[in-house]
Swiss-Prot record:
Belongs to the eukaryotic ribosomal protein eL39 family. HAMAP family: Ribosomal_eL39. The keyword Ribosomal protein applies. This is Large ribosomal subunit protein eL39. Keywords: Ribonucleoprotein, Ribosomal protein. One of its GO terms (molecular function) is structural constituent of ribosome. GO terms for biological process: translation. GO terms for cellular component: cytosolic large ribosomal subunit. The keyword Cytoplasm does not apply. Pfam families: Ribosomal_L39 (PF00832).
C-alpha cells in the first residue's frame, strides 16, 4: 500500500479498523452468552475492503 494516501481513503481504513473489533465482554455477560460472535467481523487476508 502506498505511503501517501488520500485523506478519504485513510479515514475509510481507520473506520474499518475500528469496526473490526470483537464483541465486548460486558455484552457477552449481559446477554448470558447468547451474543458471542460479531457478524461483520473481517479478516485482513480473507475478505478485502472496497477501496
Amino acid at each position: 500500500m502506498a505511503r501517501n494516501k488520500p485523506l478519504a481513503k485513510k479515514l475509510r481504513l481507520a473506520k474499518a479498523m475500528k469496526q473490526n473489533r470483537r464483541v465486548p465482554v460486558w455484552v457477552i455477560v449481559k446477554t448470558n452468552r447468547r451474543v458471542l460472535t460479531h457478524p461483520k467481523r473481517r479478516h485482513w487476508r480473507r475478505t478485502k475492503l472496497k477501496e
